[in-house]
C-alpha cells in the first residue's frame, strides 16, 4: 500500500472511514473483484479499520461520567469505566 494512501486514511473522519470500509466489505463479499484488486482493497480496509479503532479509543478517553454526592447533586467528573 502506498504511503499517500495511509496518509489519506489518517485524515478521514470516523464516519467517512466506516462508510468506505463498509463499501470495501460489500465489494469483497460480492466476489466480483479481481484478485490483485481484492488484495489492494483488503489492505486499504485494514488501514480504515485501524483508523476507526484509533478514533474510537480517542473518543472513549474523552468520555467522562458525572459524579454525584449522597443527595444526587453533581460534584464533578471522573473517567468513564467502560466494562
Swiss-Prot record:
An example molecular function term from Gene Ontology annotations: exodeoxyribonuclease VII activity
Keywords assigned: Cytoplasm, Exonuclease, Hydrolase, Nuclease
Presence of the UniProt keyword Secreted in the record: no
This protein's name: Exodeoxyribonuclease 7 small subunit
Subunit comment: Heterooligomer composed of large and small subunits.
Lineage: Bacteria, Pseudomonadati, Pseudomonadota, Alphaproteobacteria, Hyphomicrobiales
Source species of the chain: Bradyrhizobium sp. (strain BTAi1 / ATCC BAA-1182)
One of the protein's GO biological processes: DNA catabolic process
Subcellular location: Cytoplasm
Catalysed conversion reaction: Exonucleolytic cleavage in either 5'- to 3'- or 3'- to 5'-direction to yield nucleoside 5'-phosphates
Function recorded in the entry: Bidirectionally degrades single-stranded DNA into large acid-insoluble oligonucleotides, which are then degraded further into small acid-soluble oligonucleotides.
EC number: 3.1.11.6
Amino acid at each position: 500500500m502506498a504511503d499517500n494512501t495511509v496518509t489519506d486514511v489518517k485524515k478521514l473522519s470516523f464516519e467517512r472511514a466506516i462508510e468506505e470500509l463498509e463499501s470495501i466489505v460489500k465489494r469483497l463479499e460480492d466476489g466480483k473483484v479481481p484478485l490483485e484488486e481484492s488484495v489492494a482493497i483488503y489492505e486499504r480496509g485494514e488501514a480504515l479499520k485501524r483508523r476507526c479503532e484509533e478514533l474510537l479509543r480517542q473518543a472513549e478517553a474523552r468520555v467522562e461520567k458525572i459524579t454525584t454526592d449522597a443527595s444526587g447533586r453533581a460534584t464533578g467528573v471522573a473517567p468513564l469505566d467502560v466494562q
